[in-house]
Structure formats: structure tokens, C-alpha cells
């Protein structure tokens, strides 16, 4: 969450071989979830002719991917982390804008959420029998010329992924991903958002950074391949 996942989804979903670009909020606990994924996609979009992939992103611990169950043998798994300070700031900023009082508008609660997510992802990687690929999420914005060719190779895409992407029917809509104006640009925006109004307690940030470094290293160590800062 808040790790350029909407940007990643749009870049991937703009390729002729890939369908999907938004978060579908599905638990993949058995192969029947793949039918649900296709049904959710068809609510707003149509499959591209001669395409190979159907994309989804799992951003929260509420949604699981049970790869030990039959039916998931042919999926491709990409995993990414974003460093804690900007991620936590982005979470707080997002929830502070909501009209109702939100738990994650608190830097302390957002930090707790972030740490719990990292720990679940690291555990997932330690126990995963299938191949997966890791990248530092910041590379989508800071060095797409390095990251996108690697992603194209992992997914066996020809032509390779482009820095330009399509604006789709669900782009910017609530519960579909990033709802800011940035996602409507159609290309990678390298503007760094100012979060100077948010204060994360130093002890909390220090703890998040320690967990991030540990979990990130574990995810890199177990990956089939990785691209890092």
C-alpha cells in the first residue's frame, strides 16, 4: 500500500499481453478465486485479444495468496517494498483526508500497519516454493529505465514495458487504487510529494526502518531475481 502500486498496475496493464490494472480485493485461497478475478475484471473491462496475463495486486494482510493449493502453478509473482518514511507519511496523508475519523491517520497506527505488512510479506517469501521477483518500489519513479526492462524480462514481454500508460475506465476511482491527479498523467511523474506537515515519532520510525531492512533483505535473498536501489 502506498508503494507506487497504482503506477505499476497501469504500466503493466497497458501492455498488450496483460489485462487488469486495479486492486480487486480478492482472497486467493483456492483456484475458484481466479474465476472471481476474471468476473471482477469483466465488470468494467474486456480481455485483450491474444493476451496472456490477468493482473491483480494484494496490498493488505486481509488478502492472502495460498499458493500451496492446486490451480496457481502458472502465476507470476512480483513483490516490492517502499522505504518506511515516505510510505508511512503517504498512508497518514491519505487517511487524514477522509471525512470520518480513520485509524491510520495516526502516524503510530500507520507505522504499526506498515511493520505488520512487512513481516507478513517476509514470511510469505521464506515459505514460498514458487519463483518470485523483487524490486524496490522507488525504482518505478526514480529509475524506470532500469526497472522496466527487468520486469519485461521476468514476464517475457515483447515489446517491453513502456513508461507511458493508458488511462482506463477505473483509473483514479475509489477502492481501485490511487485517486490523486498524478495517476491521470499517463506517464511516470517524478514529483516528490511534500509531507513536511506529518511527524512520525523518531522511535517509531527507527523501529520501522529496522524491520524494513531485515524484511527487505530476506525478500531479496529468497527471490529468483531482484532489482534494487
Identify the meaning behind each predicted range.
Residues 1-52, 164-222:
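PAPS-dependent sulfotransferase catalytic core
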Residues 3-9, 28-30, 63-65, 86-90, ...:
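Short catalytic/ligand-binding loop motif for oxyanion handling, primarily in non-cytosolic enzymes
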Residues 22, 54-57, 134-136:
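Short beta-strand segments
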Residues 36-37, 59-60, 109-117, 200, ...:
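Soluble or luminal CAZymes and related metallo-dependent hydrolases
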Residues 47-67:
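Glycine-rich phosphate-binding loop used to anchor ATP phosphates in small-molecule kinases
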Residues 60-162, 181-186:
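PAPS-dependent sulfotransferase catalytic domain
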Residues 225-229:
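C-terminal non-catalytic accessory extensions
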Amino acid at each position: 500500500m502506498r508503494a507506487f502500486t497504482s503506477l505499476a498496475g497501469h504500466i503493466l496493464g497497458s501492455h498488450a499481453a496483460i489485462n487488469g490494472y486495479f486492486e480487486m480485493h480478492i482472497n486467493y485461497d483456492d483456484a475458484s478465486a481466479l474465476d472471481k478475478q476474471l468476473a471482477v475484471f469483466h465488470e468494467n473491462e474486456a480481455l485483450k485479444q491474444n493476451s496472456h496475463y490477468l493482473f491483480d495486486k494484494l496490498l493488505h494482510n486481509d488478502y492472502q495468496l495460498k499458493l500451496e493449493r492446486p490451480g496457481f502453478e502458472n502465476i507470476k509473482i512480483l513483490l516490492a517494498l517502499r522505504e518506511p518514511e515516505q510510505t508511512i507519511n503517504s498512508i497518514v496523508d491519505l487517511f487524514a483526508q477522509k471525512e470520518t475519523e480513520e485509524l491510520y491517520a495516526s502516524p503510530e497506527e500507520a507505522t504499526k500497519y506498515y511493520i505488520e505488512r512487512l513481516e507478513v510479506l517476509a514470511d510469505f517469501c521464506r515459505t514460498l516454493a514458487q519463483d518470485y521477483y523483487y524490486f524496490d518500489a522507488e525504482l518505478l519513479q526514480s529509475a524506470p529505465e532500469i526497472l522496466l526492462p527487468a520486469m519485461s524480462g521476468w514476464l517475457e514481454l515483447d515489446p517491453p514495458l513502456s513508461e507511458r500508460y493508458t488511462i482506463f475506465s477505473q483509473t483514479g476511482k475509489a477502492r481501485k487504487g490511487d485517486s490523486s491527479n498524478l495517476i491521470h498523467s499517463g506517464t511516470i511523474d517524478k514529483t516528490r510529494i511534500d509531507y513536511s506537515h506529518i511527524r512520525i515519532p523518531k522511535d517509531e520510525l527507527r523501529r520501522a526502518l529496522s524491520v524494513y531492512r531485515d524484511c527487505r533483505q530476506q525478500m531479496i535473498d529468497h527471490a529468483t531475481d531482484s532489482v534494487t536501489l
